[in-house]
Curated annotation (Swiss-Prot):
One of its GO terms (cellular component) is cytoplasm. It comes from the Bacteria. CDD domains: thiolase (cd00751). This is 3-ketoacyl-CoA thiolase. Heterotetramer of two alpha chains (FadB) and two beta chains (FadA). It catalyses: an acyl-CoA + acetyl-CoA = a 3-oxoacyl-CoA + CoA. It is found in: Cytoplasm. Keywords: Acyltransferase, Cytoplasm, Fatty acid metabolism, Lipid degradation, Lipid metabolism, Transferase. Catalyzes the final step of fatty acid oxidation in which acetyl-CoA is released and the CoA ester of a fatty acid two carbons shorter is formed. The keyword rRNA-binding does not apply. Pfam families: Thiolase_C (PF02803), Thiolase_N (PF00108). It comes from Shigella boydii serotype 4 (strain Sb227). One of its GO terms (molecular function) is acetyl-CoA C-acyltransferase activity.
């Protein structure tokens, strides 16, 4: 079976969804920009040699509809002979895109693929056109479709206090801002055209969603956002709304060597699981455990974790049940996470994987794990190994 390697991984800056940098930039353009950039950064691979493009996107309507993967590829002037497919596993869509490409390569049906994902939550809101089947309430609590309430449920079940959530959210912003200031994101962010507050076209090379002024004291003043009477989850401890895309060049190890391209990491194992929709945010725990089992590893073998921060109330129970509470500052989301950077749904899986690869290199660790919860009760995880 072929070894699957990541040759390159990049992302756009994360733009604020409400009147932000990409308010006049379409999702297809964000995607095409990264496709072009990956090919330009790796000229040894001819675009015509790509076997497929797998692109995650959740709200597949309006500008994100009608197979955005293909539309973006055409905009990027990828040869018409290269196919493209849009993947939807809600929050895990672009990580699923990676898994789909990896399996094609493992079986020998592909040698080189572009994978990634996008979500423009300013142009196509998360709730746009959502119409749950009324019969679902016979089998699943109606609140299971309300992500904030599932986070409230997890917080109550696991004893996660408001103070713990506020502290974690402040940490996310502080670490993301420190990473920005130190240049830690420089290797992954591709400058992307957008508009500043005055409408002037400019190149953005930083995440505009981060709030460096965030403090625990300020967060403590916010009202609960989803359960106004008994709740502890606020807008400040939830993932920000942002627009962005991320992309990776995935190849068989043999093809990368043929072309003289240096792999950055191998895909060591992959896992996806289901869980109770009412605690959808718990999905990373069984997904991570399954991925570790497939890799023949334990959590202690992992040098760095990237865990998507849907909510502080959601990620903290996952950290606790993976036995990592004492290692948060050494291993988990060292450059902040979605609370600070936002969670553009179809983008985030590739985004956290991209950040993870850079952290693995910077920390000089052998293994890294990226994992996410998924709306309606799923979890997805990938173990990477440095080459």
């Amino acid at each position: 079976m072929e070894q699957v390697v990541i040759v390159d991984a990049i992302r756009t800056p994360m733009g604020r969804s409400k009147g932000g940098a990409f308010r006049n930039v379409r999702a297809e353009d964000l995607s095409a920009h990264l496709m072009r950039s990956l090919l330009a950064r790796n000229p040894a691979l001819e675009a015509a040699a790509l076997d497929d493009i797998y692109w995650g996107c959740v709200q597949q309507t309006l500008e994100q509809g009608f197979n955005i993967a293909r539309n973006a590829a055409l905009l990027a002037e990828v040869p018409h002979s290269v196919p493209a497919v849009t993947v939807n596993r809600l929050c895990g869509s672009s990580m699923q895109a990676l898994h789909d490409a990896a399996r094609m390569i493992m079986t020998g049906d592909a040698q080189a693929c572009l994978v990634g994902g996008v979500e423009h939550m300013g142009h196509v809101p998360m709730s746009h056109g959502v119409d749950f089947h009324p019969g679902l309430s016979r089998n699943v609590a109606k609140a299971a479709g309300m992500m904030g309430l599932t986070a409230e449920m997890l917080a109550r079940m696991h004893g996660i206090s408001r103070e713990m959530q506020d502290a974690f959210a402040a940490r996310s912003h502080a670490r993301a801002w420190a990473a920005t200031q130190s240049g830690a994101f420089k290797n992954e962010i591709i400058p992307t055209g957008g508009h500043d507050a005055d409408g002037v076209l400019k190149q953005f090379n930083y995440d505009e969603v981060i709030r460096p002024e965030t403090t625990v004291e300020a967060l403590a003043t916010l009202r609960p956002a989803f359960d106004p009477v008994n709740g502890t989850v606020t807008a400040g401890t939830s993932s920000a709304l942002s627009d962005g895309a991320a992309a990776m060049l995935v190849m068989s190890e043999s093809r990368a060597h043929e072309l003289g391209l240096k792999p950055r990491a191998r895909v060591r194992s992959m896992a996806v699981v289901g869980c109770n929709p009412s605690i959808m945010g718990y999905g990373p725990v069984p997904a991570s455990k399954l991925a570790l089992k497939k890799a023949g590893l334990s959590a202690s073998d992992i040098g760095v974790f990237e865990m998507n921060e849907a909510f502080a109330a959601q990620i903290l129970p996952c950290i606790k049940d993976l036995g990592l509470m004492e290692q948060i500052d050494e291993k988990i989301n060292l450059n902040g996470g979605a609370i600070a950077l936002g969670h553009p749904l179809g983008c985030s899986g590739a985004r956290i994987s991209t950040t993870l690869l850079n952290l693995m290199e910077r920390k000089d660790v052998q293994f890294g794990l990226a994992t996410m919860c998924i709306g309606l009760g799923q979890g997805i995880a990938t173990v990477f190994e440095r080459v």
